[in-house]
Amino acid sequence: PYAYRAAYLGHLGEYHCPSCGTARPPLDVGAVEVRLAGMAGSTFVLAAGGQRVALTTVLPGLYNVYNVVAAAAAVLALGIPLPIVAAAVREFTPAFGRAESMTIAGHPAYMLLAKNPAGFNEVLRTALADGRPIVAVIAINDLTADGRDVSWLWDVDFEMLSDRCRLAVVTGIRAHDMAVRLKYAGLPQAAVVVEPDEGWALRRGVEALRAGEPLYVLPTYTAMLRLRHILARRGLVHTSWED
């Protein structure tokens, strides 16, 4: 197995093989001086071809710094000048459901799509970044676009919620599976509520919030579409095709 000097996200990091000497190749494009600001976004310096430019993105989380760097690497390879790349990053806004922000009953709310273990881990780290226990609505479906097999939930590090989640309202087709996963992650029984109806799940999450406290909505793909449909009917978000 690889040995890591630093592991940043999943299997990504500064690695080498102690046996054969294989190692991460030198970077053509990278991010340095990364500063994460929770749901407020991130700042970092994009380094490419001997040039460096300071960037701010509204996209939260280290995983989105990786996404920005990957997109920058692709367009730089096509010959787009770095200043144009930097301007595009600064003007970018997230797609619906991906770190989407809204206000529900006077509270800030954030929707963070999660589709696989590595992504869900980063979503959880981002939601927990300010150090306060959170209130979350976790919506899990198992339709074709989500993946029929939900055993991947056992590969997500939900244990990080064990003492940092004041309430988790689980909903969606596989709400009970999610509740079982949280039980074995160490969440107290009183901290997990099963509410199969997505609209009522949102309501129960909001009702549990204290003044100024945000709600984190963590859905799989089709659950995200269902939740946004409910929120759009209430006039809280645009319908997807209007974004």
Q: Residue locations for each model-derived region?
A:
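ATP-dependent carboxylate-amine ligase
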Residues: 9-24, 73-82, 87-243
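Membrane-targeting and insertion segments and their boundary/processing signals
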Residues: 41-45, 59, 94, 152
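General secondary-structure propensity
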Residues: 53-61, 191-193
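Extended acidic/charged loop-beta regions that coordinate divalent cations
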Residues: 1-52
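Short glycine/threonine-rich catalytic loop with a Thr-x-Gly-x-Asp
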Residues: 59-70, 96-97
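Glycine/charged-rich beta-loop-alpha catalytic/anionic-binding loops adjacent to active sites
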Residues: 48-57, 102-107
